[in-house]
């Protein structure tokens, strides 16, 4: 994969930075003594614990490599080896032993590297360990469809290692050649950066405060960034040429931070561009079709979103968004997830979501569906876990021609008697194939709704034919039924009567719906649609 440049042995630590090792304490652990070792390289410090037997194993490996004299390690002691004076003397001798190993060469051989955990905390140790791993696995990782996970420490080590004019590997060991890393990152297509708000192990480094550069990842198509500080990430703009999927979690407070690293110039650049599209002087992320900005601290959908003109799917769930803005620029978007935000109104949303087919607004603060009535491409709508109370709110979406799935779970509306039947009755022919709250419409529900629609159709036809006088008995009974429906539903929509209102017009005709056990009537006498329509006609 790479040729090893001329080099000395081992791995050099942090360039010319001072390296110091101290055995700061000795602790009795069960039947042995553990020595606490503190290592400092530049401004990074970490601690480890080792027992004497581990020192002995290290020494044997170094002797085999002819790196130390056999007598250099303090000898074993079989009697009184737990005595305080002896432990203190050995602590000092082990400290001298380790410091001598560090001082003898700028480079650390692999056994010493692992013993002191330079492969976890030191940029040279980390880059060497990564190079060795990639020597064996790089081709398989690049060829697979699995996302390669990397840490900020690994990326920081690569970034810093590239800045130094040093040999590419140690002791002509082709396995640890840094060239393997360079070859790998230029071929990698799928990557997830897994950060943290915590310290890196026992060290003084904070994981999300490590800067790194992504500009060399020039073939990357999928990038997920979790728990990082985006202002410390260099080279993001270089990914515009290849990136197709972008996910950022627990990282930003605004979309602009990740989409427009040159954010300070945004206002002027926007003014220079067309009002209905991305600014002319700002290169767009033209290949990104999917963006996932879940679990951040976003308060708004800012205008930098227009720099993602090819988006088809956008996930903004689990944020603090209160309004749906600036999405009119995403003319290709079909799937939008705004669940678990703070949205309370949908006024005018159709003007911003013209081609949407799937919309999730679950877990917001909605009390009405007003504003969704012109989303003519909408197929799936999830408004579960909101504050929708009245059945007639569904009227706002009942004429959408493509609607197939509606989720109203965990809304007050679901506690209304015959809730499913009343909701399905508001739709036209779509109710037959409708999925409501994740449940497909049953044949029993289809029959119920068909009867309700037939009754309503017959009533509407007779009312039109008779042209009822204001003072006629029929008009009075009709008005009474409408008033009862208004009381049952505070929205006071008088365009249609519920089953309950129609049936209460005259109790002697008992216009019950088959399968409605709440009527208390003998269903065997009410199963025929013809009889029910005849009863309605007799009333007229």
Question: What do the predicted segments below correspond to?
Answer:
Residues 22, 36-38, 46-49, 56-57, ...:
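Beta-strand cores of modular interaction/reader domains in eukaryotic scaffold and signaling proteins
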Residues 38, 53-63, 95-103, 113-117, ...:
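Amphipathic alpha-helical interaction motifs in eukaryotic regulatory proteins
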Residues 53-54, 71-83, 108-120, 239-240, ...:
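Short amphipathic alpha-helical segments embedded in low-complexity Lys/Glu-rich regions
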Residues 207-218, 230-284, 288, 344, ...:
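Leucine-rich repeat domain C-terminal region
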Residues 6, 28, 42-44, 53-54, ...:
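Conserved beta-strand elements of beta-rich interaction domains across eukaryotes
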Residues 29, 40-50, 54, 75-93, ...:
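Short amphipathic alpha-helical molecular recognition features
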């Amino acid at each position: 994969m790479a040729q090893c440049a001329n080099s000395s042995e081992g791995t050099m630590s942090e360039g010319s930075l001072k390296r110091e090792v101290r055995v700061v304490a000795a602790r009795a652990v069960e039947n042995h003594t553990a020595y606490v070792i503190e290592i400092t390289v530049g401004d990074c410090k970490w601690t480890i614990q080792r027992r004497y037997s581990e020192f002995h194993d290290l020494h044997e490996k170094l002797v085999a490599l002819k790196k130390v004299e056999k007598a250099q390690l303090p000898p074993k002691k079989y009697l009184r080896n737990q005595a305080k004076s002896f432990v203190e003397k050995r602590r000092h001798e082990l400290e001298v032993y380790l410091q001598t190993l560090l001082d003898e060469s700028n480079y650390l051989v692999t056994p010493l590297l692992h013993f002191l955990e330079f492969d976890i905390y030191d940029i040279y140790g980390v880059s060497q360990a990564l190079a060795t791993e990639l020597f064996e696995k790089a081709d398989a990782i690049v060829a697979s469809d699995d996302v390669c996970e990397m840490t900020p420490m690994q990326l920081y080590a690569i970034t810093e290692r590239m800045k130094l004019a040093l040999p590419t590997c140690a002791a002509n060991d082709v396995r640890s050649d840094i060239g393997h890393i360079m070859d790998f990152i230029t071929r990698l297509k799928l990557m997830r950066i897994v950060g943290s708000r915590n310290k890196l192990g026992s060290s003084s480094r904070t994981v999300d405060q490590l800067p790194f550069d992504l500009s060399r990842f020039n073939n990357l198509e999928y990038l997920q960034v979790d728990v990082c500080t985006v202002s410390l990430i260099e080279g993001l703009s270089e990914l515009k040429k290849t990136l197709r999927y972008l996910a950022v979690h627990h990282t930003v407070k605004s979309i602009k931070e990740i989409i427009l690293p040159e954010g300070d110039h945004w206002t002027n650049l926007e003014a220079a561009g067309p009002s209905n599209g991305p600014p002319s002087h700002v290169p767009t992320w033209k290949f990104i079709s999917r963006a996932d900005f879940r679990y951040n601290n976003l308060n708004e959908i800012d205008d930098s979103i227009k720099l993602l003109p090819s988006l088809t799917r956008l996930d903004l769930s689990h944020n603090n968004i209160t309004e749906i803005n600036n999405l009119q620029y995403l003319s290709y978007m079909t799937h939008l997830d705004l669940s678990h935000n703070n949205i309370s109104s949908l006024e005018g949303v159709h003007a911003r979501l013209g081609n949407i087919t799937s919309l999730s607004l679950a877990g917001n603060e909605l009390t009405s569906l007003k504003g969704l009535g012109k989303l003519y491409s909408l197929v799936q709508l999830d408004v579960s876990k909101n504050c929708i109370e009245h059945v007639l709110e569904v009227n706002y979406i009942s004429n959408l021609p493509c609607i197939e799935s509606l989720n109203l779970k965990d809304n007050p509306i679901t506690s209304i008697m015959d809730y499913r039947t009343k909701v399905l009755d508001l739709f036209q022919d779509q109710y037959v194939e409708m999925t409501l709250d994740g449940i497909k419409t049953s044949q029993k529900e289809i029959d119920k709704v068909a009867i309700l629609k037939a009754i309503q159709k017959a009533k509407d036809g007779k009312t039109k034919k008779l042209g009822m006088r204001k003072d006629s008995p029929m008009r009075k009974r009709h008005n009474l039924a409408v008033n009862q429906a208004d009381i049952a539903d505070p929205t006071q929509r008088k365009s249609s009567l519920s089953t309950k209102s129609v049936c209460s017009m005259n109790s002697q005709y008992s216009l019950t719906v088959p399968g409605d056990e709440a009527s208390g009537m003998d269903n065997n006498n009410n199963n025929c649609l013809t009889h029910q329509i005849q009863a309605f006609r007799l009333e007229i």
